[in-house]
């Protein structure tokens, strides 16, 4: 049984569970969030930033 524990420990050290991509990290999800920010009423299309006050729902920089 201890050999199995050692093998499991070695496998987890070589391939940690944090190396697996999460659903929120997918490029498709990031593009969808970016599109939502561009449709935000405070988003300035020309300057590509959010007008002040910058809400949390806007994913871009604040214009200032």
Curated annotation (Swiss-Prot):
Modification Cysteine amide occurs at: 63
Tissue: Expressed by the venom duct. Is present in all duct parts with a highest content in part 2 (proximal of the venom bulb) and then decreases in concentration toward the end of the duct.
Superkingdom field: Eukaryota
Keywords for the protein's UniProt record, in alphabetical order: Amidation, Cleavage on pair of basic residues, Disulfide bond, Secreted, Signal, Toxin
Predominant localisation class: secreted
One GO location term (cellular component): extracellular region
Signal sequence residues: 1-19
Molecular function via GO: ion channel inhibitor activity; toxin activity
Mod. after translation: Contains 3 disulfide bonds. Two peptides are produced from this precursor. Conotoxin Tx3.5-b is amidated at Cys-63, conotoxin Tx3.5-a has an unmodified C-terminus.
Positions of the propeptide segment: 20-47
InterPro entries linked to this entry: Conotoxin (IPR004214)
Compartments, as annotated in UniProt: Secreted
Disulfide partners: 49-58, 50-62, 54-63
Listed Pfam families: Conotoxin (PF02950)
Domain comment quoted from the record: The cysteine framework is III (CC-C-C-CC).
UniProt record similarity statement: Belongs to the conotoxin M superfamily.
UniProt-recorded name of the protein: Conotoxin Tx3.5-a
Upper lineage: Eukaryota, Metazoa, Spiralia, Lophotrochozoa, Mollusca
């Amino acid at each position: 049984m201890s050999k199995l524990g050692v093998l499991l420990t070695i496998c987890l050290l070589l391939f940690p569970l944090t190396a697996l991509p999460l659903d929120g990290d997918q490029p498709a999800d990031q593009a969808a969030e970016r599109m939502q920010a561009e449709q935000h009423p405070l988003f300035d299309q020309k300057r590509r930033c959010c007008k002040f006050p910058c809400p949390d729902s806007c994913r871009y920089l604040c214009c200032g």
